[in-house]
Amino acid sequence: MAAPQLFRALVSAQWVAEALKAPRSSQPLKLLDASWYLPKLGRDARREFEERHIPGAAFFDIDRCSDHTSPYDHMLPNATHFADYAGSLGVSAATHVVIYDDSDQGLYSAPRVWWMFRAFGHHSVSLLDGGFRHWLNQNLPISSGKSHSEPAEFSAQLDPSFIKTHEDILENLDARRFQVVDARAAGRFQGTQPEPRDGIEPGHIPGSVNIPFTEFLTNEGLEKSPEEIKRLFKEKKVDLSKPLVATCGSGVTACHVVLGAFLCGKSDVPVYDGSWVEWYMRAQPEHIISEGRGKTQ
């Protein structure tokens, strides 16, 4: 295994399978299943993990590893909370973390956890290209049952440049210091299809650009090539040479925008963590752009 491979954003299923056969004590590999689904889908990610997962993987619960004092879903936890949680899963400073999920798309929620590790200073982290779907398609080994990780010491320090707040986005409406890319489906962005959360109407932040996260993926669920992703950004009139911020419904699929830019050589894209849910709940009606009901009060 060549060392540079360990720091790539994406690793292949075959690479992971080979790495599991030949573990390295100097840089242990830890697989994390970061599956997460919108509540209305009725899927239990942890139960599905216990039914089948990649051998040696642990389950990373995005909702558990979050700020439970926030009124918004799975906002980033503080550094101590993240360090304790990651350590409980067996992640140390020396660990190469590889993250995947079990979504039908290939990758859905895993890029959120990839972004979280980087935000807290752990850059030896990769995503399994194509996710568990691709692993299964390759007929690679699977396990079942609960995971049992040996706890490890892990320290974390949040890099604030990875996050944008509601105040940052509000100020940018006039200042226009950065572009905003929204990864939700087109109908939710336009205001013509419902949001999956009760009490939240669809629409978008003024001046934002829509690139649904699925547009970063091939039909097989693999990540598109950097050349294809650069072309996608260009088609959407997003300038990768200028500041860019990612948003979505609640900060999960926004991380596909971060990943796409990263693969194109732009590693400085932050996430608006509260995303559309926070924006809708806090914004004035004139700051909700929608072809639907919008916001009346």
From Swiss-Prot:
GO molecular function list: 3-mercaptopyruvate sulfurtransferase activity; identical protein binding; thiosulfate-cyanide sulfurtransferase activity
GO biological process, one term: kidney development
Classification via PROSITE patterns: RHODANESE_1 (PS00380), RHODANESE_2 (PS00683), RHODANESE_3 (PS50206)
Domain Rhodanese: 25-144, 174-288
PTM-bearing positions, type Phosphoserine: S35
Chain positions with N6-succinyllysine modification: K40, K146, K164
Binding site residues for substrate: R188
Alphabetized InterPro entries for the sequence: Rhodanese-like_dom, Rhodanese-like_dom_sf, Thiosulphate_STrfase_CS, TST/MPST-like
Domain of life: Eukaryota
Region (Hinge): 145-160
Compartments in which it is found: Cytoplasm; Mitochondrion; Synapse, Synaptosome
Mutagenesis / variant outcome for changing C248S: Loss of redox potential. Abolishes bound persulfide and hydrogen sulfide production
Positions annotated as active site in the UniProt record: C248 (cysteine persulfide intermediate)
Any matching Pfam family: Rhodanese
Chief localisation class: cytoplasm
Note on domains (UniProt): Contains two rhodanese domains with different primary structures but with near identical secondary structure conformations suggesting a common evolutionary origin. Only the C-terminal rhodanese domain contains the catalytic cysteine residue.
Other remarks in the entry: Thioredoxin (Trx) or dihydrolipoic acid (DHLA) are required to release hydrogen sulfide from the persulfide intermediate.
Subunit architecture: Monomer (active form). Homodimer; disulfide-linked (inactive form).
NCBIfam families (UniProt xref): PRK11493.1 (NF008557)
Role noted for this protein: Transfer of a sulfur ion to cyanide or to other thiol compounds. Also has weak rhodanese activity. Detoxifies cyanide and is required for thiosulfate biosynthesis. Acts as an antioxidant. In combination with cysteine aminotransferase (CAT), contributes to the catabolism of cysteine and is an important producer of hydrogen sulfide in the brain, retina and vascular endothelial cells. Hydrogen sulfide H(2)S is an important synaptic modulator, signaling molecule, smooth muscle contractor and neuroprotectant. Its production by the 3MST/CAT pathway is regulated by calcium ions.
PANTHER family registered for this protein in UniProt: 3-MERCAPTOPYRUVATE SULFURTRANSFERASE, THIOSULFATE SULFERTANSFERASE
Record's protein name: 3-mercaptopyruvate sulfurtransferase
Originating species: Mus musculus (Mouse)
